[in-house]
Structure formats: C-alpha cells, structure tokens
C-alpha cells in the first residue's frame, strides 16, 4: 500500500471512529432520552449530565475522548510502516474531529468536540493533553461554565503545542480543530455574553 493510499485509509478510518456518538449510544443503552432532544440539544457529556445521570455522562465523556485517542494512536502506530509523516497524521487529526462534529452514523448531527479533542491531544502528546486538560479544569472550577472552559482551552492548545514542538503540520491541525470547536460554540458564546449560559451540573429535564 502506497503512502498516499495509506494516508487516505487512515483518514477515512479516523472519520468513522470519530463518527460514533457515545452520547447517543450510551443514552440508548441506558434507556435515557436522546440528548439531542433536551437541554442544549448537543450530544455531548455536559448535556447528558443535565439528564441527572452522572454515570451516563461519565461514560459519554470517556467514550468520546477514547475514540479521539484511538483514531490518532492507531495512525501513529501504523504510520512508519507506510511512510506516513506528520502531514498525514495531521489529516487524521482533522478527520477524527470532523467525524465527531458530522457523524455519518447519526445523520451528520454531532457534538461540539471537547472530549474528542482532548483524546486527540493526549494521543499526540501526554504533556500537551495534560496542559490543555489542566486549563479546562481551572476555568471550569472557578467559573462553572463548561463552554467557557472549552473555549479557553481551545485557544491555548495550539500555543501549548508550538511551545513544546514548534510549528509543523500538527500545529496547523490543532489550530484548525480549535477554530472548528470555537465555531461549534457560537450559541454558547452568545449565551455567555447574555448571562444565560447553563452552569456545570444544572439539570434540564428531558421534554
């Protein structure tokens, strides 16, 4: 298999892995309402938490992070065998993230990508992932807004990468991922500015 074909295969596989929406899968398995029908309507861990089921929210968080990590880890593992370099891995990063945002298995209606991005960053570098997660935790602890924590973390993640490894294709992929994540939070940004954003742990009962 040529390098180009391998890169395409890795990217398609990453997209398909990213397309598994654990918010929907876990909610169905546990007999809960579809997270796209209540709260923010976002199929993600924070919205699942609004159902009042912490176990489901934790499983969603872990699943979405794990798929991001798995997609990139597998590509990195196999890349040397087929001569796939950083540019190819960068495409895998973007493909996995797009899979979560626009999942083929769920009518292209996906989440905002916070947990999946965290998994991807951890796969690229443990230090990068931990620095970004620490940023999220600090903002979330002090302000109690998951969306604000995600936005701040998204802004800092590319800079953390550049500080650790310099500017390369992966830095560009992380920047693209951050822009996409911020774009998915447009409604949250508007609510934050209006003082109407829901805080972490607030329950919005399914309708």
UniProtKB/Swiss-Prot annotation:
This protein's source sits in the domain of life called: Bacteria
Q: Which residues cross the membrane?
A: 4-24, 58-78, 86-106, 120-140, 162-182
Membrane topology field: Multi-pass membrane protein
EC numbers, comma separated: 2.3.1.275
Q: Which InterPro entries match?
A: G3P_acylTferase_PlsY
Reaction catalysed by this enzyme: an acyl phosphate + sn-glycerol 3-phosphate = a 1-acyl-sn-glycero-3-phosphate + phosphate
For the biological process aspect of GO, one term held by this record is: phospholipid biosynthetic process
Primary enzyme class: transferase
The answer on whether this UniProt entry bears the keyword tRNA processing reads: no
Q: Where in the cell is it found?
A: Cell inner membrane
Single GO term (MF): acyl-phosphate glycerol-3-phosphate acyltransferase activity
The pathway that the record names for this protein is:
Lipid metabolism; phospholipid metabolism
Annotated keywords: Cell inner membrane, Cell membrane, Lipid biosynthesis, Lipid metabolism, Membrane, Phospholipid biosynthesis, Phospholipid metabolism, Transferase, Transmembrane, Transmembrane helix
Q: Got a GO cellular component term for this one?
A: plasma membrane
Record Pfam families: G3P_acyltransf (PF02660)
The entry assigns this protein to a family as follows: Belongs to the PlsY family.
Q: How does it assemble?
A: Probably interacts with PlsX.
Q: What does this protein do?
A: Catalyzes the transfer of an acyl group from acyl-phosphate (acyl-PO(4)) to glycerol-3-phosphate (G3P) to form lysophosphatidic acid (LPA). This enzyme utilizes acyl-phosphate as fatty acyl donor, but not acyl-CoA or acyl-ACP.
Q: Which NCBIfam families match?
A: glycerol-3-phosphate 1-O-acyltransferase PlsY
Q: What is this protein called?
A: Glycerol-3-phosphate acyltransferase
